[in-house]
Amino acid sequence: MYEEWLDKYEYLIELGKSLNDYPESAKTDDRLIKGCQSRVWLDYRVEDGRVVFNADSDAIITKGIISLLIGLYSGRTPKEILSSDFSVVEKIGLKENLSPTRANGLVSMIAKIREIASMNV
């Protein structure tokens, strides 16, 4: 079990490294996700009716988590995002293997993605 979760953490770290560059000038308070212990900035734009996310974090595991969420939901329409099964995170066992503060941050990240989608329906 330990090795399996070590592999998943290593995968999250690699995902975090794969995020697009996030400009320092975009790291503003209005882009911070509230409820995360680490600082997580989330930005978006709408292109051809699809929401495209970009993000960064000052913590490597958290950066991997937001990268995973971006991979799942970026490029979808707001309606697709809102009708998505967000329990996928629970199905892969991510939430229960995070510290309570990281798990709360994960919930906050998902809530922010859903909020952005609902603002753009």
What is each PLM-predicted segment?
Residues 1-39, 44-50, 76, 89-121:
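N-terminal intrinsically disordered, cationic/polar leader segments
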Residues 30-36, 56-57, 79-84:
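Solvent-exposed interaction patches of small proteins and small membrane subunits
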Residues 53-61, 70:
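Glycine-rich active-site/cofactor-binding loop and its immediate structural neighborhood
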Residues 65-76:
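Alpha-helical support elements that line or immediately flank enzyme active sites
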